[in-house]
Amino acid sequence: PLLKCVNLMFTSTGLRAAGSNGNCIVTARGDNQSTGDVSLLIPAASLGKLSNMCQDKDEFRVGTTGKSIVFFRENFLFSARLMEGGYIDTDQLVGSIRNAFTVLTDIHDMRAALSSVLSIGTGNRVKLNFQDQRLVFQCAGDCVSASAPIEVIALTGTPAGDYWFNAKQLVTCLKALSGTVTLGIAQGGMLTLATQDAYYL
């Protein structure tokens, strides 16, 4: 799974969540009406089961009972065991990231291009080649190679260079996003993906 645990935070500005699998950090914004001053650690597998049993439009009341968190609404109750321990300050971490350049593009186009080059099945790495207003996805093997370009809009800096990423992790991240995305390359060739409600690092 992408995440092992999720830090669920009820803040003064609404519901927030953060998680990491050691290679990728994800933050997301939820309902702005769910305010408070509580931070909880929940197994990602438990939240995954809950999401499979409901839809985005469903609304729940949330409470804690000892070492468990309970989500409930009419004729439905779901309980998950809370995890102990602290969590990294993701706001501070994300705020420290400085992108060398950023571009605006469409998640659907990125998914289609990535799927196209991975169809040759030559491994688990994909190269992202930035050429100003174009982003080219590339994969290569001993006897075969594939590339798929998409149009991007340069926002900051000068998009240029080749960057290699884990294809499986990139596929997983893109599946969870939709609409337009601000894609950036930070220090050390780190990839950042930012949408209106989520941030992937």
Where do the model's predicted regions map?
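DNA polymerase processivity clamps
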Residues: P1-M83, S96-L201
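Specificity-determining recognition surfaces
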Residues: D89-Q92
